[in-house]
């Protein structure tokens, strides 16, 4: 199986290689997020837009690969057997108790990524994190992200 194909420069080549090495009748499972489905509300439209844009571009990699898994498997010659999608929602989070919503990245690591990709000035890092933490304390924090999964089979020989 594969997860995090979005971190690859060419996800279609990776899936094609999986199809090449799986035996006839064998299966490949693929699961990944699709950052184009990412939604965030922190009571500040400017910060929300900055976060959405950063997550969707993901350092120039194909961050929307999740929704494309079915097509990638099909184009690699695999026969899709099953597909599913699930949306994770984060709403309740106390930044004074944990650095990140359960099962999610921390806002500090997000800010570090934004600085590393020149989408946030280093001098703005603390203010950015503070605004998101303040929104969470006011119960104005919510995020959603959809993951996609595909199981595909190599046709029998």
Q: Could you describe each region identified by the protein language model?
A:
Residues 76-79, 96, 145-157:
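Core SAM-dependent methyltransferase catalytic element
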Residues 67-71, 127, 147:
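Amphipathic alpha-helical interaction segments
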Residues 82-143:
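C-terminal helical/coil "lid" or tail adjacent to the Rossmann-like core of SAM-dependent
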Residues 12-27:
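A short glycine-rich, Lys/Arg-flanked "PGG" loop and its adjoining helix->strand segment in the class I
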Residues 27-95:
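Conserved catalytic/acceptor-binding region of the Class I
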């Amino acid at each position: 199986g594969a997860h995090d194909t979005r971190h690859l420069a060419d996800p279609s080549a990776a899936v094609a290689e999986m199809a090449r090495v799986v035996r006839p009748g064998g299966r490949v499972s693929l699961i990944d997020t699709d950052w184009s489905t990412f939604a965030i509300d922190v009571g500040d439209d400017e910060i929300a837009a900055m976060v959405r844009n950063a997550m969707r571009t993901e350092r120039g990699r194909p961050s929307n690969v999740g929704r494309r898994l079915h097509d990638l498997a099909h184009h690699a010659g695999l026969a899709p057997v099953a597909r599913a999608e699930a949306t994770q929602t984060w709403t309740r989070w106390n930044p004074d108790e944990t650095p990140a919503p359960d099962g999610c990245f921390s806002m500090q690591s997000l800010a570090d990524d934004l600085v590393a990709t020149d989408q946030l000035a280093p001098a703005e890092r603390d203010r950015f994190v503070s605004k998101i933490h303040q929104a969470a304390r006011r119960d104005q924090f919510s995020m959603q992200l959809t993951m996609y999964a595909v199981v595909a089979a190599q046709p029998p020989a």
